[in-house]
From Swiss-Prot:
Polar residues bias spans: 9-47
Organism: Saccharomyces cerevisiae (strain ATCC 204508 / S288c) (Baker's yeast)
Protein name according to UniProt: Protein MTH1
Protein family membership: To yeast STD1/MSN3.
UniProt biased composition (Basic and acidic residues): 77-87
Gene: MTH1
Length: 433
């Protein structure tokens, strides 16, 4: 009966890792395998088969010696070694860390392969895995820590150009209902059409409103950079911070002290009143959306932008109305002056015109006065004297042309109505008292 040798399977490898009682049992196992008749297989097969027990015996004896010489380290030494290795990894550069991790990982792989047949391979692999079990995880953690720790070493941006300071996209500043309602109402820059107004210096101050940001960019650090413009005649620009989670007082103060329409020289009281009204309206709308009354509004980006644009529109309309009012008042004064200086026929003053009974009414005093005037001005006749007197009177009247309160109130109301109608606003002009 032919008996074949057991195949070298994983089961056989597991059996090799089981502890052996003594060296004699190894020889017994080898002798039992050698008892197979030689005539049942060829010579080459027999030679290779006889060499198998010898290699297994030598491998098992080597493993036994390694087991006797191996000493398990106490847990505190293991933890201390692990901490020391981590410290060295953190102190090394990223390239050295990756090279060190790969070399240690390959070394651990070679060690596990060399000791695959040993009885203590499981213990050794578990000891190695406790330190280098997840090199990718350690590398990821080191990368994150190094990126955070190395960022302050980079030079922070303290000066930016106007193009770099302005936002590149605007889709998060407006609700989807506005952006998706009618594509024809969207400008080429992605903003709605109502952000473009035919008002005095609107484009300039719209750019200034876009420089109000809700958060700092990472490359700015903890401070707002300076906006650089080219040219001496360029207007002033600066970045302002207004977080989404801000109190009403912070929002009002930021709007009032902004650079919006600084050239119009609007009075502080008007800007403060306009900012308070804008924030109060936004609070009512926020409470209607959220259904709760918050001490500090946690605004969304569209709500936040809506507050800025409403305040900008209020002061822009006021600046436009005041500009139109000054022009209308100047034009009205010129018209009144022209009406008062209409050309009249060249006639002497009424006191000089002789009456019908001049011979009876003229006194000697009047005759003497007229004679003295003619004697003092022998080269000028009476008509020239009358024209000089009329010119002096007109010059005095020109300096005294003014408008009454009723006239100013009427002109102001007309300017407001024209601006509101031109912009399509349903606002009501101030009533004339």
């Amino acid at each position: 009966m032919f008996v074949s040798p057991p195949p070298a399977t994983s089961k056989n490898q597991v059996l090799q890792r089981r502890p052996l009682e003594s060296t004699n049992s190894n020889h017994g196992f080898a002798s039992s395998l050698q008892a197979i008749p030689e005539n049942t297989m060829s010579g080459s097969d027999n030679a290779s088969f006889q060499s198998l027990p010898l290699s297994m015996s030598s491998s098992q004896s080597t493993t036994s010696s390694r087991r006797e010489n191996f000493v398990n380290a106490p847990p505190e030494y293991t933890d201390r070694a692990r901490d020391e290795i981590k410290k060295r990894l953190l102190a090394s550069s990223p390239s050295r860390r990756s090279h060190h991790s790969s070399s240690m990982h390959s070394a651990s792989r070679r060690s596990s392969v060399a000791e695959s047949g040993s009885l203590l391979s499981d213990n050794a692999s578990s000891y190695q895995s406790s330190i280098f079990s997840a090199p990718s995880t350690v590398h990821t953690q080191l990368t994150n820590d190094s990126s955070f720790s190395e960022f302050p070493n980079h030079k922070l941006i303290t000066r930016v150009s106007l193009d770099e300071a302005l936002p590149k996209t605007f889709y998060d500043m407006y609700s989807p209902d506005i952006l998706l309602a009618d594509p024809s109402n969207i400008l080429c820059n992605g903003r709605p059409k109502f952000t473009k107004r035919e008002l005095l210096d609107w484009d300039l101050n719209d750019i200034r409103s876009l420089l109000i940001v809700e958060k700092l960019r990472p490359e700015w650090g903890n401070q707002l950079p300076e906006v650089i413009t080219v040219g001496d005649n360029m207007p002033q620009f600066r970045l302002q911070l207004l977080p989404l989670y801000s109190s009403d007082e912070t929002i009002i103060a930021t709007l009032v002290h902004s650079d919006l329409y600084m050239e119009a020289n609007l009075d502080y009281e008007f800007k403060l009143t306009s900012a308070k009204y804008t924030v109060a309206t936004a609070r009512k709308r926020h409470e209607h959306i959220t259904g709760r009354n918050e001490a500090v509004m946690n605004l969304s980006k569209p709500e936040w932008r809506n507050i800025i644009e409403n305040y900008l529109l209020n002061i822009a309309v006021e600046a436009q109305c005041r500009f139109d009012f000054k022009q209308r008042c100047s034009e009205y004064k010129k018209w009144k002056l022209q009406q008062s200086n209409l050309k009249r026929p060249d006639m002497p003053p009424p006191s000089i015109i002789p009456r019908k009974n001049s011979t009876e009414t003229k006194s000697l005093l009047k005759k003497a006065l007229l004679k003295n005037i003619q004697l003092k001005n022998p080269n000028n006749n009476l008509d020239e004297l009358m024209m000089r007197s009329s010119a002096a009177t007109n010059q005095q009247g020109k300096n005294k042309v003014s408008l009454s309160k009723e006239e100013k109130a009427t002109i102001w109301s007309q300017c407001q109505a024209q601006v509101y109608q031109r912009l399509g606003l349903d606002w009501q002009p101030d009533s004339v008292s």
